[in-house]
Amino acid sequence: MGRVRTKTTKRASRVVIEKYYPRLTLDFQTNKRIVDEVAIIASKRLRNKIAGYTTHLMKRIQRGPVRGISFKLQEEERERKDQYVPEVSELEKDKINVDQDTKDMLKALGYDSIPTVVVAASRPERPFRYRH
């Protein structure tokens, strides 16, 4: 069974990561020294728990965004992804190929005036074969 981390440990680790992300690494010993420098922690055991959870979160951050932690680099990455505009829109097509049945359904619904809908040549249906 694993150990449960307290709210104090988790909150302290998140704050340390948000403020000092560029200085932290994936190494526990390095993170332990950084946590010792930047925070006043009452006991050695609590410092080690915070450093351990910080290292754990840093490894998770390497794989992707972590819920509850936002730092400048992650915000910039999210902004860049949100602002992306493709060169060719998927919504604006020159023509849409449909079969005759679909064209008839569009006509019945009153959408027969769409200029981009083109009836594609229907393929001859192959007879269904059973596997023996």
Swiss-Prot record:
Its main location: cytoplasm. One of its GO terms (molecular function) is structural constituent of ribosome. Keywords: Cytoplasm, Phosphoprotein, Ribonucleoprotein, Ribosomal protein. InterPro entries: Ribosomal_eS17, Ribosomal_eS17_CS, Ribosomal_eS17_sf. One of its GO terms (biological process) is cytoplasmic translational elongation. The keyword Ligase does not apply. GO terms for cellular component: cytosol; cytosolic small ribosomal subunit. The modification Phosphoserine is found at S43. Component of the ribosome, a large ribonucleoprotein complex responsible for the synthesis of proteins in the cell. The small ribosomal subunit (SSU) binds messenger RNAs (mRNAs) and translates the encoded message by selecting cognate aminoacyl-transfer RNA (tRNA) molecules. The large subunit (LSU) contains the ribosomal catalytic site termed the peptidyl transferase center (PTC), which catalyzes the formation of peptide bonds, thereby polymerizing the amino acids delivered by tRNAs into a polypeptide chain. PANTHER family: 40S RIBOSOMAL PROTEIN S17. There are 2 genes for eS17 in S.pombe. Belongs to the eukaryotic ribosomal protein eS17 family. NCBIfam families: PRK01151.1. Component of the small ribosomal subunit (SSU). Mature yeast ribosomes consist of a small (40S) and a large (60S) subunit. The 40S small subunit contains 1 molecule of ribosomal RNA (18S rRNA) and at least 33 different proteins. The large 60S subunit contains 3 rRNA molecules (25S, 5.8S and 5S rRNA) and at least 46 different proteins. This is Small ribosomal subunit protein eS17B. The lineage of its organism: Eukaryota, Fungi, Dikarya, Ascomycota, Taphrinomycotina.
